Amino acid sequence: WIMGHMVNAIYQIDEFVNLGANSIETDVSFDDNANPEYTYHGIPCDCGRSCLKWENYNDFLKGLRSATTPGNSKYQSKLILVVFDLKTGSLYDNQASEAGKKLAKNLLKHYWNNGNNGGRAYIVLSIPDLNHYPLIKGFTDTLKQEGHPELLEKVGYDFSGNDAIGDVAKAYKKAGVSGHVWQSDGITNCLLRGLSRVKDAVANRDSGKGYINKVYYWTVDKRATTRDALDAGVDGVMTDYPDVIADVMNEAAYKNKVRLATYEDSPWVTFKK
């Protein structure tokens, strides 16, 4: 999965997919009442990027639905996975469950079209703080209450705070999650970060006994870092430059080892070599 980073304006969906992304990451900010409000990152953000692009969250969801609904004039068949980077740092811990409920209602209405031929992309809810694990239950309970438990098949989870792998496992246990887990690791492109935790996550994924199904590394903008990440065995790389990742995947060392994921590749099933 080549994951376009910080895709917060509707026009950027096409821009990143056309550069080679089959997945995007979108920031979600919340208002004081835990309503998802804008797709907005703000300052500071990655070096070389504008931090200030935004849409109203519901408008973005409608644009995303168009891009991921077969038959729509804006349909992009390659776009199969969306990571919502939930900026829950602005919320009190006791609002996490409420944020999950409201997120579920927004997605159900504006993205899944109330279960009636909505967008088809898989969704990852990425949460920066382990203490906000109740967001997951708020989300899953709401989809069930609204009569659409089947949509949970399209939803996965990520804790993005670079916490110890054992602590992340405990948070999932509390949230009642087993499966559909992506584990992120990374840092802004302005700084360097080693791959030791990525390797730990890959080992957990491949052990058959861990909680992780997929691993992604962010933010990867250079060819050398891309090669290191692919060599470490990641499933996804998040990038500001999808074309750089695509180029490296076409290099002789990789072109017979890795390929771009398609809609038929489940993002929840650990790939067996």
Swiss-Prot record:
Cell cycle is among the record's keywords: no
Active-site residues from the entry: 5, 41 (nucleophile)
One term of GO molecular function: metal ion binding
Signal peptide feature range: none
Cofactor field: Mg(2+)
Gene Ontology biological process terms in this record: killing of cells of another organism; lipid catabolic process
Positions bound to Mg(2+): 25, 27, 85
Tissue: Expressed by the venom gland.
Main location: secreted
Protein's recorded name: Dermonecrotic toxin LhSicTox-alphaIA2bvi
Phylogenetic classification of the source organism: Eukaryota, Metazoa, Ecdysozoa, Arthropoda, Chelicerata
